[in-house]
Amino acid sequence: MALTLLRGMRTPVVARRNAGLFFTTLQTPLLSRFTTRAESARAAAHKSIQLATKEAAEQKTQSFEAVIGIETHVQLSTVTKAFCSCPYSYGSQPNSTVCPTCMGHPGTLPVLNAKVVECAVKLGLALNCEIATTSKFDRKQYFYPDLPKGYQISQFDIPIAKEGYLDLDLPVEFGGGHRRFGVTRVHMEEDAGKLLHSESGSYSQVDLNRAGVPLLEIVSEPDMRTGIEAAEYGAELQRLVRYLGVSNGNMQEGSLRCDVNVSVRPIGQSNFGTKVEIKNMNSFSAISRAIDYEISRQILLHKEGQADQIVQETRLWDESSQKTFTMRKKEGLADYRYFPEPDLPEVVLTSEYIDEIQNSMPELPEAKRRRFENMGLSMQDVLFLANDDNVARFFDSTLEHGADAKLAANWIMGDIAAYLKNEKLSIDEIKLTPLELSELIASIKNGTISGKIGKEILIELIAKGGTVKSVIEEKDLVQIADPAAIEAMVDQVLADNPKQLEQYRSGKTKLQGFFAGQVMKASKGKANPVLLNKILGEKLKANS
């Protein structure tokens, strides 16, 4: 990377041009004017990055386009590790679930966990991949303190699955639309350990609990063009592994980790630009923001004639500064010196084995979205219901008990979702059952209770459980649908509010809502609102 030094004549001030931006190092106390100039330079640099970020987000007005691919590591929810019988549980005491095999002791031999192969085939099929009937393991060799063997067991030239794709629907707030992103390969490998750094930074410790834990790496084609598309791709993969039950997909626990490759090129150019890998993104929102920043950084360098400063490297996303920083220069495949793993045989799969797994596959998110869409639900409803497998199951079960699809979706997306958000609960943690939600919807639809009373009953059922019928009976909540009874209440309210009635006659017709509210109050919310408005309208018209 080019380095330009600018030295002041009297004061040893060193200014460095890095990535097209000025950074100033003060070697001795300066006069305030030099400090002001340095701050102004930094402010101008920060402003230029912000402007470039905004421009990059509006790709249509740019002369550059981004090319984005993602490598996703999914930690499998197997009982034991990939090549030994050690269990793994997130948060365990450091180095408490290890053995000579996963610690890399001499003379130990790996034994493949058959469940890892099953999970790999499941995910490969879900990603519409070609499953290899014969694949093999390889040694990926590199040195790092958390890699006890000095190599990682992975798959190199013959992965277990390849040439697939992932379909998804973008959220409505991001423009909507269907997308299909290619999947280059899915391969099996083992995880490394973890370094624990001291607060002072003076030393690090190694926890090998995670060493040997099975992973699936999913490599996408460079088909994405925006941070939003990449984030939604990652979110769809998370949904997929959760639907399949192969992983919990929790990014906070490291069960799903995304490394993003980003490059930019002039629109219309077929050759790829120099790609940069970004790590350390712990949420899908962070993925989107990191990519948008990196796109803006690279476009800025191109516009300033410094494209040669974009080098193949690994950069870390820093959440506090909302920027990426150089971590290391990117290694090439030759640096890993791959060669076949001599201690493991080839993985040979029969067509019967693959078919058996195919036939046991659950309904996947894409198929579920299309089914919900065919029910006449809006795309917003479809995405909300299908994005969480537990919510989708609750919705389907409610329909099985006879509820109308649109009404059930409205209740789940409205009052139930609001309660879950406020209480920080998932839908499988509440006491309301799909049967009782369908009963509640039916009770409102047939006029037994009003919608207002229905909301009150819903909250009680969510928090305490029980049945709709018992709550209605215990609290005497049956809707008043007798016209004579409602008429009597309307007459009483009009008689009790002569001043408002006179104002209504003078043209303040909005007071009809006031009278309706008073009747509902007198009936404790049980008056049939349709019948009430009809009778009230007739009475007010007669009194005008």
UniProtKB/Swiss-Prot annotation:
Catalyzed reactions per annotation? L-glutamyl-tRNA(Gln) + L-glutamine + ATP + H2O = L-glutaminyl-tRNA(Gln) + L-glutamate + ADP + phosphate + H(+)
What GO cellular-component annotations does this UniProt entry give? chloroplast; glutamyl-tRNA(Gln) amidotransferase complex; mitochondrion
Q: Give the matching InterPro entries.
A: Asn/Gln-tRNA_amidoTrfase_suB/E, Asn/Gln-tRNA_Trfase_suB/E_cat, Asn/Gln_amidotransferase, Asn/Gln_tRNA_amidoTrase-B-like, GatB, GatB_C_1, GatB_Yqey_C_2, Gln-tRNA_amidoTrfase_suB_CS
Compartments where located: Mitochondrion; Plastid, Chloroplast
Q: Which UniProt keywords apply?
A: ATP-binding, Chloroplast, Ligase, Mitochondrion, Nucleotide-binding, Plastid, Protein biosynthesis
The EC designation for this entry is 6.3.5.-
Q: Where is the major localization of this protein?
A: mitochondrion
What biological processes does GO assign it?
Answer: glutaminyl-tRNAGln biosynthesis via transamidation; mitochondrial translation
Care to name a GO molecular-function term for this sequence? ATP binding
Q: Which Gene3D superfamilies match?
A: 1.10.10.410, GatB domain, N-terminal subdomain
* Function summary: Allows the formation of correctly charged Gln-tRNA(Gln) through the transamidation of misacylated Glu-tRNA(Gln) in chloroplasts and mitochondria. The reaction takes place in the presence of glutamine and ATP through an activated gamma-phospho-Glu-tRNA(Gln).
Tell me the protein family, please.
Belongs to the GatB/GatE family. GatB subfamily.
UniProt miscellaneous comment: This protein may be expected to contain an N-terminal transit peptide but none has been predicted.
How does this chain assemble?
Answer: Subunit of the heterotrimeric GatCAB amidotransferase (AdT) complex, composed of A, B and C subunits.
- The identity of this protein, by name, is Glutamyl-tRNA(Gln) amidotransferase subunit B, chloroplastic/mitochondrial
The source organism is Oryza sativa subsp. indica (Rice)
